[in-house]
Amino acid sequence: MIVHKQLRLSLAYCLCQPLLDLHIGGSPRSTLRTRPATSILSRLKGKHFASGAKKGDKKGICKVCGSERTNRFASTLLALPDQGKVGRALTTDTFANGSTWQYDGLNIRFRDWPFIHRARLNCLPVNNVKSRWSNSCPKCRHCNSDETLPHVLCHCLRNMPSILRRHNTIVDRIVNAVQSGTITTDQQVRAANSRLRPDIIVEEYNKVLIIDVCCPFDNNAEALRDAEQRKLNKYEGVKQFFVGQGKQCEVFGFVIGALGSWHPTNENVLRQLGMSKRYRSLFRKLCCTDAIQGSTNIYREHLGMTEGSVDADNSE
């Protein structure tokens, strides 16, 4: 019985591995090495029985096999230079906020499902991707830049109104979570003689919080860290102005990836706002799915899709 299950796992691996190894514009590995069921069992036997499971414990053995298979697939995906970059950004989130919607569908629409899974693997038919296996022009259909997915979701000038709406949705969610203090949104600090407009300023007594939201593309975890650092550097002058007035001032970059990655240092903002543990859990998930919804809208509008359209593969 166990051998038959292992054979099925090996078959599943053979079927799924080409999808994981496939780079857009390339081809799967010409040869796939599969391990016989007996070799898999021998490799897992020590792990399984070392954990205290008894011989003949089918449920325990299957659990170990499933975990081993999942880890192998995940390692293969994360090792891919292009299709694994979003996955590497998602792994920094210990709460898995960017993926829990797959189980409960929280704040996710039907149209978001086909978009987000292909977007995270860079399999959407934007011109730069299509040009890898065809003679199509890689240029953006609305400007002269290469039409990559990061360009569509974060940089194309034609999409800026939709990009701003995605940004403002997250700003509004943070504002609604503020429990006390005077809130200022998108306003210059005139006394500081600065033209900068922080997304959110919360003042309470002699304490000032400056929160600025951004949604960079999930190009590895470093992209999220760099985006946060740019926010800290940008508002350092405004921070020093409030410090000079004898106030305690903190600057926070609130970073949500365009494809739903949660930056770990966002936890500092949640603590400063005094959120309960239960609401924090919900808030994280809502912010990630807000970003996914906004990116879906941006992509569909970029391709000129109407409300009745279901799939983007046939859009030009």
Model-derived features with residue positions:
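Metal-dependent nuclease catalytic cores in nucleic-acid-processing enzymes
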Residues: K231-G246
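Active-site metal-binding core of divalent-cation-utilizing nuclease and nuclease-like domains
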Residues: V129-S134, R173-C214, K234
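Short beta-strand-loop-alpha-helix junction that forms the active-site gateway
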Residues: Y205-R230, I256-A258
